[in-house]
């Protein structure tokens, strides 16, 4: 084989190996995603906690606006 063909073959093998390693590194995260999707209950609790935090934030913003409205303008 000529050196040009060997270099081309080397790069092709390198690209395929890189793609395979990327695919194999995705497998654990895919399994973790499937497990969390099957459980499901934890996600609902997380969303409920986020909604509660958002409501608290809205309440604090309203209190801050009310406080700023009471301050005198200079």
UniProtKB/Swiss-Prot annotation:
| Source taxon at top rank | Eukaryota
Output a single Gene Ontology CC term carried by this record: extracellular region
Keyword Signal assigned: yes
Write out the entry's keywords from A to Z.
Answer: Amidation, Immunity, Secreted, Signal
Localisation:
Secreted
Organ and tissue specificity: Expressed by the venom gland.
Coiled coil stretches, renumbered: none
- Residues with Lysine amide modification: 39
* Propeptide position ranges: 40-74
A biological-process GO annotation:
immune system process
Point out the signal peptide segment.
Answer: 1-22
Which family is it part of?
A: Belongs to the non-disulfide-bridged peptide (NDBP) superfamily. Short antimicrobial peptide (group 4) family.
The task this protein performs is described as:
Shows anti-inflammatory activities, since it decreases release of pro-inflammatory cytokines, and increases release of anti-inflammatory cytokines. Acts by blocking the Toll-like receptor 4 (TLR4). Also increases MHC-II expression in LPS-stimulated cells. Does not show antibacterial activity on Mycobacterium abscessus subsp. massiliense. Does not show antifungal activity. Has low hemolytic activity on human erythrocyte and low monocyte cytotoxicity. In vivo, does not induce immune cell migration.
What is the protein named? Peptide ToAP4
Q: Which organism is it from?
A: Tityus obscurus
């Amino acid at each position: 084989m000529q050196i040009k063909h060997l270099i081309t073959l080397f790069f092709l093998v390198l690209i395929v190996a890189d793609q395979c390693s990327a695919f194999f590194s995705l497998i654990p995260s895919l399994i973790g995603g499937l497990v969390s999707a099957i459980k499901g209950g934890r996600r609902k609790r997380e969303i409920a906690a986020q909604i509660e935090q958002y409501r608290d934030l809205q309440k604090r913003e309203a209190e801050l606006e009310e406080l700023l409205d009471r301050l005198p303008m200079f």
